[in-house]
């Protein structure tokens, strides 16, 4: 897994290319990601880079976390995130060092992970794109009903993962291979073509695309 950055979704706008084409972009504000811990096989059983970003009032930081940030010599951030490291990755980073948008200077495609907008309780037609049943022809009650959810006494249960009505959205979603239109190092911004998961103001993780 490649090293990425944690940012905040600012909103959407558009930029114009040299040929005059209008490109819709999502603006991601990426404040410096501070390394709080470098995990290793010997001590943690796996290799990873733990980072934080932003700031948090001292009164809102728990004592264990306050001690963790103090040990790293960094200011308390709004959360902790990890990036798994492959062989040879992350050797240039030490506790207290910073990651900025400059690491995307030569990247063209990115994967963006965020928490999708919650849509509340939704039926199967809206949530899973089920087809509706007949509007007439004798159907008076089951227009949007899901239909059968199982078999008979054997197996005698509804299988796990069955698509049914329930909470829609508010789950971790990754959108892959989005074009990175611009890296604004001066204002710590990433401009990514198209929409990314999550509401305005939510945290997102941006990484080089695995399928690029």
Swiss-Prot record:
Post-translational modification comment from the UniProt entry: Methylated by PrmB.
Key words of the record: Methylation, Ribonucleoprotein, Ribosomal protein, RNA-binding, rRNA-binding
Xref: InterPro entries: Ribosomal_uL3 (IPR000597), Ribosomal_uL3_bac/org-type (IPR019927), Ribosomal_uL3_CS (IPR019926), Transl_B-barrel_sf (IPR009000)
Pfam families membership: Ribosomal_L3
Listed GO biological process terms: translation
Annotated organism of origin: Idiomarina loihiensis (strain ATCC BAA-735 / DSM 15497 / L2-TR)
Family according to the record: Belongs to the universal ribosomal protein uL3 family.
Positions where N5-methylglutamine occurs in the chain: 153
Any single Gene Ontology cellular-component annotation: cytosolic large ribosomal subunit
PANTHER family attached to this UniProt entry: 50S RIBOSOMAL PROTEIN L3 (PTHR11229), LARGE RIBOSOMAL SUBUNIT PROTEIN UL3C (PTHR11229:SF16)
KW Ribonucleoprotein (keyword) present: yes
Protein name, as recorded: Large ribosomal subunit protein uL3
Keyword Zinc attributed: no
Function: One of the primary rRNA binding proteins, it binds directly near the 3'-end of the 23S rRNA, where it nucleates assembly of the 50S subunit.
GO molecular function terms listed in the Swiss-Prot or TrEMBL record: rRNA binding; structural constituent of ribosome
Subunit (UniProt): Part of the 50S ribosomal subunit. Forms a cluster with proteins L14 and L19.
